[in-house]
């Protein structure tokens, strides 16, 4: 990441980064046949995955965690997650739902 001195420039840089993230959202089967929504592709060096997960869990009223650089949410929330990530500033066109 280039060195940015001006805080406004840093905010703009983060916004541009958000719009360039290719995010993949899909489901996996967890224990006992339960589903979990997996969100991967968000750069964990540039963005606080814990904070994003916290916001998503609050909006979706579900549990979840951050593991191995990806966000895991309990239940199938694929379509809702796409809209919520777009609301957080990520480009909706680059969010791939499987």
Curated annotation (Swiss-Prot):
Superkingdom, natural source: Archaea
Pfam families assigned: SUI1
A GO MF term: translation initiation factor activity
Keywords linked to the UniProt accession: Protein biosynthesis, Translation regulation
Entries under InterPro entries matching the protein: DENR/SUI1_TIF, SUI1, SUI1_arc, SUI1_arc_bac, SUI1_dom_sf
Signal peptide residues on this chain, from the entry's feature table: none
Gene3D superfamilies: SUI1-like domain (3.30.780.10)
Family under the similarity heading: Belongs to the SUI1 family.
Protein name: Protein translation factor SUI1 homolog
Gene source species: Thermococcus onnurineus (strain NA1)
């Amino acid at each position: 990441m280039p060195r940015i001195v001006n805080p406004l420039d840093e905010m703009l840089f983060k916004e541009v980064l958000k719009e360039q993230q290719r995010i993949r959202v899909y489901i996996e089967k967890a224990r006992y046949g339960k589903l979990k929504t997996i969100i991967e592709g968000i750069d964990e060096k540039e963005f606080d995955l814990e904070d994003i997960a916290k916001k998503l869990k609050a909006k979706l009223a579900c549990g979840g965690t951050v593991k191995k650089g990806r966000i895991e949410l309990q239940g199938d929330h694929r379509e809702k997650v796409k809209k919520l990530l777009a609301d957080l500033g990520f480009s909706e066109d680059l969010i791939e739902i499987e």
